[in-house]
Amino acid sequence: MPLDKTIKKVLIIGSGPNNIGQAAEFDYSGTQACKAVKEEGIETVLVNSNPATIMTDSHIADKVYIEPLTEEAVEKIIEKERPDGILAGFGGQTALNLAMNLNDAGVLDKYNVRLLGINSEAIKKAEDREEFKNLMEEIDEPVPKSIIATHIDECIDFVNKFGLPVIIRPAFTLGGTGGGIASTMEELKEICDRGIKMSPIGQILLEQSVAGWKELEYEVMRDAKDNCIIVCNMENLDPVGVHTGDSIVTAPSQTLTDKEYHMLRHSALKIIRNLKIEGGCNIQFALNPKSNDYIVIEVNPRVSRSSALASKAAGYPIAKIAAKIAVGYSLDELKNYVTKNSSACFEPALDYVVVKIPKWPFDKFNTAERHLGTQMKATGEVMAIDRDFESALLKAVTSLEGKISGLRLEKFEYTTVRELLEKIKKQDDERIFAIAEAFRRGVDVKQIHEVTEIDNWYLNGINRIIDMEKELQDKNNKDKDKSIIKAKKMGFTVAEIARITSLEEGKIKNILNVNNVKPVFKMVDTCSGEFEAETPYYYSSYENEDENEVTDDKKIVVIGSGPIRIGQGIEFDYCCVHGVWAIKEAGYKSIIINNNPETVSTDFDTADKLYFESLYIDNVMNIIEKEKPEGVIVQFGGQTAINLADKLYKNGVKILGTSFESIDLAEDREKFSELLKELNIPQAKGMAVTSMEEAYEAVKEIGYPVIVRPSYVIGGRAMQVVYDKLALQKYMTEAVTLSTEHPVLIDKYIKGTEIEVDTISDGENILIPGIMEHIERTGVHSGDSITMYPYHTLPKEVVDKLVKYTKSLAKALEVKGLMNIQYVYDGENVYVIEVNPRASRTVPILSKVTGVPMVKLAVEILTGKNLKELGYGVDLKKDNKLYAVKVPVFSNEKLANVDIYLGPEMRSTGEVMGIDSDFEVAIYKGFRAAGIEVPKDGGNLYVSIKDVDKQESVPIIKKYTEFGYKIYASLGTGKFLQKQGIDCEVLRTDDLMKAIGDGKINLIINSPTRGNTVGTRGFSIRRKAAEYKVGAFTCIDTAKAFLTAIKVKREEAKVEYRAMKEYFK
């Protein structure tokens, strides 16, 4: 079937902000979908609330709406645009749920809009747990014994009949939110209660647990002619019981027999045919390893996280093909876009092994519950490709970037075998390292299999890695050089081989060089070399044949940003992608190195050449030595890329833009402090300390409160405001490792307005596209603050000072390209908080709201131009006639035992933007886009305010009462408010907890004296609010801003939704 000519205009719904369970993979799939439809001459309209995405760039769709993903907003956009169809399968669960709500409310019928690729009936059959179960039984596909429950009593009856454990899966939720495995009646009641509340339709599936069975996924495509193919099948290393997003995954599956593979393949094709899905679909199975029994776990009737992984693993652009199918094409009419020589009907063939490892946020949250279950906790993932499992696994582990060297965690070296086996029983993020350590201690595969139920094939692979370690350590080894070569080919890093053998790294490198041990580069071409590929991508391997054609063209390498994590999100992938595009425009060949399967940067057609590799110095240098580029850009890939600057510099690599010396100066506390003194720019009083005694002395001189943090951080990790000696002592012993190499920085905490300045510099002149002001005062991490463009309260003399200081710093640091500076204004002086000589997380939003292509201009400077040639002027650009408000989004409900208070440690996983020509409406849109309900008629508000904020909170609480809120309070706050004439009811903690659980509290304002202290009353209240999705503000500035949103709602102000182009007319 050719293109459907009746489709003239299509609305694509994005996925909104990044959060746990829904991250960059939907920017990748949404961008592909927009491009695929647009190139058919169909008008594309995109709605998405996430300004950090490539898909919200003005050229990706004909019209781009950065507006809240709410029924109200999208209905108004449909009314205005009148699309013929909607693509809802490329924006994750958010888009699917929104499309279903619009369908059920009659909006799609009213405006004669079709759901393309998947109809509402298929969505219901896949997403509604009861309908799904009924369909599977109808087509004779096995599902576990289960019931659909909407009340706790039904759950208890089921367990009384069939026993524990059971798995609880809420309907229409994301990343397993609200679900879990219950092994006791107490757990059953708690998880079921939470799951029913978190499901948008109040429904959960309760099913008999098959924990311990193998978990497998099949990525399937189907068209309207009923052509079906399997793109890729994947196997979770962890058995059923761990969410697939939290599991180590291999592609293709490694342990299935041919019979098992085809049995599940047949089932997957039968399911997609009966659901009548046209496009992509992900089907998850559980397989009993002791028999041929299997069950169908669930179906995602859309492009998913696993689709992104399958796309990159197989080299098959699932989202692009699915979008083409949705507008009428069939698989046999489409080409494979990687080979351009074969049909999209051919199933990809993989002659390599792919390993995905999740990236968890536990390095930031040391109090978090690390147990992995059916509710996803990972923020991102890495993918590695090699010719065998062992090499791919070691490459993936290296890609995680933490303080990890091979399959080793230092802390396990001091544990007993019994402790290790106890640790291995529990499914958590460290289990694979505990397994490796158990093998080092002589525990055998059989014993570990009994404890973990991980297939012996995988355990044998891990054991072979440990055997290699033992061979390297063997004092009687007569041919150590041979063992070193063997280890390198297996995937060991030079640093790890040096550590194991106690030899210098230089000596190891020499042995490898003398023996000409260098990697070759193999292609991902979807067809195991059967057809010639036009746009393949590459991975390294220690084999003989090199499939990589290196040209003499002038080329530039961009270092990617690695896995999505808190503090380094999709914004940096945005910068890398724009960097690659600008390099092409400047007449160079673009090369990107990255390891994140979720992103646009690792799409097959983004750069001229993609290397899917670990961002470890060994791997990066192998590519640079092979390609011999004109230079390397590190300023777009966040702290990951910046951290490579030192090693690249020492290896003689030319870093384009700001020099390594300047990067180091900005990061080095003492050197930078001296520079500020020379430039006469005020800074908060601070010191670097390397011992407890020095810390006490420093605080004596500076005075409490202080901000403490390690040097070289990302996202404010292990950063805290400290108010007294006890808190300082606790921080120094628990949060950081003190040493002369890693000093701790202690700064005076200055309370004031925080300001963000992003600038482009050519070494002489600067261009500041806009100045952004934070709503929350200092002490809250910039990534967690509500941020306004343009600035709202700053006097002209302060703005002049900001421009002057920024110019001085750019010149002194000889910045070429992008730089971000954070300032604080305390009402009298402007102080520099920090300087980042690189792209920041505000570059995408600032580029969009000012119309200045910041990354493109930076690349033009890096390739020889200056600002005056580029046509955007110099110094501070005049503000556009619009207001933009960036609102952070958190995944608090996903991470048990983590405090939600806002402080200097970044916690948000994503962001949204509210944009309007009216400032108050922009704030309203921002809160709505962040998923926060804005009530018109008040509700029940609980307040508990720390002493220093009490007086300031009075007019704010009074305003809430005027807006119809009944006030409940803690004892201390209640007494204070009553004295101020505010009517309130004091609630004991137990009563409050019950009220939150019963849904009787709508909003909480709780400014903690000391956040992050597990076990306190405030911590318990904040956690309960997170788990039951009750809005909680921990900063009174946020609570004050929310009043503005309520005001807009109460006044029924006319809220208009505009395409971005309308603001630039």
From Swiss-Prot:
Region: Oligomerization domain, residue numbers: 402-548
Enzyme class, first EC level, given as a word: ligase
Cofactor note: Binds 4 Mg(2+) or Mn(2+) ions per subunit.
Cofactor field: Mg(2+); Mn(2+)
Chain segments carrying region Carbamoyl phosphate synthetic domain: 549-931
Positions of the UniProt region annotated as Carboxyphosphate synthetic domain: 1-401
EC number: 6.3.4.16, 6.3.5.5
Residues at which Mg(2+) 3 binds: 822, 834
Binding locations of Mn(2+) 3: 822, 834
Pathway assignment: Amino-acid biosynthesis; L-arginine biosynthesis; carbamoyl phosphate from bicarbonate: step 1/1; Pyrimidine metabolism; UMP biosynthesis via de novo pathway; (S)-dihydroorotate from bicarbonate: step 1/3
Keyword Metal-binding: yes
Amino-acid positions noted as binding Mn(2+) 4 in the UniProt annotation, renumbered to this chain: 834, 836
Record note on quaternary structure: Composed of two chains; the small (or glutamine) chain promotes the hydrolysis of glutamine to ammonia, which is used by the large (or ammonia) chain to synthesize carbamoyl phosphate. Tetramer of heterodimers (alpha,beta)4.
Name of protein: Carbamoyl phosphate synthase large chain
Native organism: Clostridium acetobutylicum (strain ATCC 824 / DSM 792 / JCM 1419 / IAM 19013 / LMG 5710 / NBRC 13948 / NRRL B-527 / VKM B-1787 / 2291 / W)
